[in-house]
A protein has these predicted regions:
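Sec/Tat signal peptide C-region and signal peptidase I cleavage site
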Residues: 14-22
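N-terminal secretory/targeting leader peptides
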Residues: 23-119, 138-364
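Divalent-metal coordination cores built from histidine and acidic residues
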Residues: 119-120, 133
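Hinge/lid segment of periplasmic solute-binding proteins
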Residues: 126-141
Length: 364
């Protein structure tokens, strides 16, 4: 249990904890679940620079690599206990503590409601999502303040050693899938889903332990090195068509920050969401072209995948709503939003998609 580790860590963290207030300056040390080179960490550093600028240097954030203070699996508990000032991960990492975390971090199949990454942000900003997100931490009984920073999706279905033409082909393969509800949904449709840490994926592919894998989208996937092992890349997937990363600040440390500077941090977080969304479109486009030059074949996901995954996702979502009142409340809020917004948004995006595909065809 995490609490049993606290005493062992406390002595080692005395020097670390000296990041407390000094002359009105709050310095926050924030551990990521990633190493220091990932593009996500770069965006976190950009956020930290904005915070420092908007607070005139009264609040500064230092980003530490994954595992540098506590194991990544203990990160949210360490922030809660005050062993570390803050953490950075994806909200759905904590679905084991509360299933509703998935509806904020990676609502499978667009929460079963046709919500894409941009529509999810509309719900978050304009239809009560932010207030429910703030409530999530109380529901999890955690002394943290969450800051949604990075909408990343849509994520790709993944990388395969050979083409798949149907779900029957997919079911023959061992597939690295996200942990938690997305991975379970794959199992529900008969896919041999395997959960493993990022550092284990490429070795597992090289050794034949797994046959296919997902991680994110073109830029992170290219940087990860999937193209060195696999050549068939399927962009359209439903397990994380919406995916978001966030920062968690210990509640006591947060209360040491003035109300004015807290507001500045929220403004910086809003800017970070825009930066992440807009930068990803361009960066993923550049990375996709690079992958194609390296011999990667871009494939279309079989139609029966969408039918089967959507049905299983809806069953999983309903089961969680039946079992957890707060999950049901969040999902109902998303449904109310979707009933009003998705018919318009999906219709508008349909014409945009056709326009984009027509232009893309001229480039071949």
């Amino acid at each position: 249990m995490f609490k049993n580790k606290v005493g062992l860590l406390t002595a080692a963290l005395v020097a670390f904890s000296s990041s407390a207030i000094a002359d009105g300056h709050v310095h926050l040390k924030v551990q990521s679940v990633l190493n220091s080179t990932g593009s996500e960490v770069g965006y976190v550093r950009d956020f930290a620079e904005d915070v420092a600028a908007l607070t005139d240097g009264r609040v500064t954030i230092e980003v530490l690599p994954g595992g540098s203070v506590v194991p990544n699996s203990d990160l949210i508990d360490a922030v809660d206990a005050g062993l570390i000032d803050g953490g950075f991960a994806w909200t759905h990492y904590w679905s084991g503590k509360h299933p509703a975390a998935m509806l904020f971090g990676s609502p499978i199949a667009g929460a079963g409601l046709g919500i894409d990454n941009i529509a999810w942000l509309s719900w978050f900003h304009s239809a009560g999502g932010k207030e429910l997100y703030d409530q999530l931490w109380d529901e999890m009984d955690l002394n943290v303040v969450g800051l949604m920073l990075q909408p990343v999706g849509p994520e790709a279905l993944g990388w395969f050693k050979e083409p798949i033409n149907s779900m029957d082909d997919f079911r023959k393969l061992r597939f690295r899938a996200p942990p938690g509800i997305p991975g379970q949904t794959y199992k529900d449709i008969g896919v041999a889903a395997v959960a493993m840490g990022g550092g284990d994926i490429l070795p597992a592919l090289e050794k034949g332990v797994i046959d296919a894998a997902e991680w994110c989208c073109p830029e992170p996937d290219r940087d990860f090195g999937f193209q060195k092992v696999l050549k068939y890349y399927y962009l359209q997937g439903l397990h994380q068509n919406v995916v978001n990363a966030d920062m968690y600040i210990n509640g006591d440390r947060w209360n040491e920050i003035s109300a004015r500077d807290q507001h500045a941090i929220h403004v910086a977080a809003r800017a970070a969401r825009l930066d992440s969304m807009s930068n990803r479109i361009y960066a993923n486009g550049i990375a996709m072209a690079d992958l194609l030059e390296q011999g990667v074949q871009l494939m279309d996901t079989p139609d029966d995948y969408f039918v089967e995954f959507m049905a299983a996702a809806n069953a999983t979502l309903q089961k969680n709503a039946d079992e957890n009142a707060f999950f049901a409340e969040v999902w109902a809020s998303q449904r109310d939003f979707a009933e009003k917004a998705v018919p318009f948004w999906s219709g508008a995006q349909s014409s945009n998609a056709k326009l984009g595909l027509a232009f893309a065809a001229t480039l071949k």
